[in-house]
């Protein structure tokens, strides 16, 4: 007999979300037994991160929302900024440590969810289920059996793709000596940053008060920067573009998100599935993941409760993924100017509609209307050449250290 109906591997956003949904008792439906396996402290455990998403409805993780906004601002390289109201949508920010505290509090009260701290060495199919091979902090090994396994760990390699770019970023949590931020608006894309020879870059500001914000430098390109390169880029944006003046750096956050048109497998065995970013929850053209993984885990939890096959659904529609493939190709080939494209879209499309489009929540005629506001010729050429392009492997870079808390820096 399996030790659990479900084993969830990894306690990041996807793993915690699925465990949280399965811990809830629903009258008339099954409540599966769950083992959540979290990596021990060290390099395998995700560092603190910031997640953003948008929604008009209340959600199960609202208590973890650190801040929310209904105004977004996009700044082209020159000229006036584009600003709009996102109503009824709200752009929300969650810090992973707040999210983990909320979920852990609820899981601790669940009689059907058990947590283990161990390194997962292998996940393998067996007749009627799967085995998870574990090693604990003392070096002891054991095998955990389950009917279903949901693995949220990052894959060791990516499937071959026609186009792969990296969205890589480095940010400072800053506190300024004087009020310089507008806490009512997010600086979503500020293209006044130096543009790389290949790809695009922009600044990103999430203000939580007039004197505090997360200030990030972001690139869409083929290669990450060095740690010194990231520090220089954020310092230039904070000091020379935003002109923050006297400031303290309270913490730093670094990350790399893969933007690819590769088909990401969501099932790796008869009883083994991938969820979250590992299961294709990341929107290829934007890097946003949180909303997609919530759609996946909601569907998986519902299937398990009803005794159905719990294969995670695609987090994004085929239509959305095809449009993303065209955009990635157009950016990677240099046919379109990234800052000009995004500035033009935000200037010509209502903010709320564009956010719904970026989350795959628009109808075909709305997608067509938005597509006609892009450079049609270059986008059409990119679409026509895609079927002829070979798929090539992509070597994942070694990500820089992320989410560390350095000594406070004053400038």
What feature does the model see in each segment?
Residues 1-35:
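N-terminal Rossmann-like FAD-binding beta1-loop-alpha1 element of flavoenzymes
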């Amino acid at each position: 007999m399996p030790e659990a109906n479900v084993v969830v591997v990894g306690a990041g956003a996807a793993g915690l979300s699925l465990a949280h949904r399965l811990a809830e008792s629903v009258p008339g439906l099954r409540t599966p037994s769950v083992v959540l396996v979290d990596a021990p402290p060290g390099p395998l455990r995700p560092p603190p991160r910031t997640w953003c998403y948008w929604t008009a409805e209340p959600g199960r993780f609202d208590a973890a929302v650190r801040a929310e906004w209904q105004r977004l601002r996009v700044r082209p390289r020159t000229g006036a900024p584009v600003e709009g109201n996102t109503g009824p949508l709200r752009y929300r920010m969650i810090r992973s440590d707040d999210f983990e505290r909320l979920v852990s509090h609820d899981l601790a009260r669940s009689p059907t969810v058990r947590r283990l701290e161990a390194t997962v060495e292998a996940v393998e199919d067996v007749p009627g289920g799967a085995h998870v091979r574990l090693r604990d902090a003392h070096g002891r090994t054991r095998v955990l059996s389950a009917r279903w396994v949901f693995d949220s760990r990052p894959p060791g390699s990516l499937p071959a793709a026609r186009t792969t770019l990296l969205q890589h970023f480095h940010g400072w949590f800053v506190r300024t000596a004087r009020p310089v931020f507008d806490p009512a608006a997010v600086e979503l894309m500020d293209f006044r940053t130096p543009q790389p020879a290949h790809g695009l870059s922009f600044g990103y500001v999430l203000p939580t008060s007039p004197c505090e914000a997360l200030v990030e430098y972001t690139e869409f390109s083929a290669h990450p920067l060095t740690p010194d390169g990231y520090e220089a880029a954020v310092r230039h944006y904070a000091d020379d573009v935003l002109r923050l003046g006297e400031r303290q750096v309270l913490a730093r956050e670094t990350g790399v998100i893969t933007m690819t048109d590769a088909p990401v497998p969501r099932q790796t065995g008869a009883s083994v599935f991938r969820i979250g970013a590992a299961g294709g929850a990341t929107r290829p053209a934007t890097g946003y993941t949180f909303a997609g993984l919530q759609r996946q885990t909601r569907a998986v939890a519902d299937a398990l409760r009803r005794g159905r096959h719990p294969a995670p659904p695609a987090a994004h529609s085929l239509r959305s993924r095809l449009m993303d493939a065209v955009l990635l190709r157009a950016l990677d080939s240099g046919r379109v100017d990234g800052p000009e494209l995004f500035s033009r879209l935000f200037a010509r499309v209502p903010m709320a509609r564009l956010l719904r489009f970026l989350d795959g929540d628009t109808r075909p005629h709305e997608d067509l209307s938005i597509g006609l506001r892009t450079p049609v010729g270059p986008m059409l050429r990119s679409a026509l050449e895609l079927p002829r392009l070979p798929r090539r492997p992509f070597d994942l870079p070694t990500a820089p250290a992320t989410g560390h808390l350095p000594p406070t820096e004053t400038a």
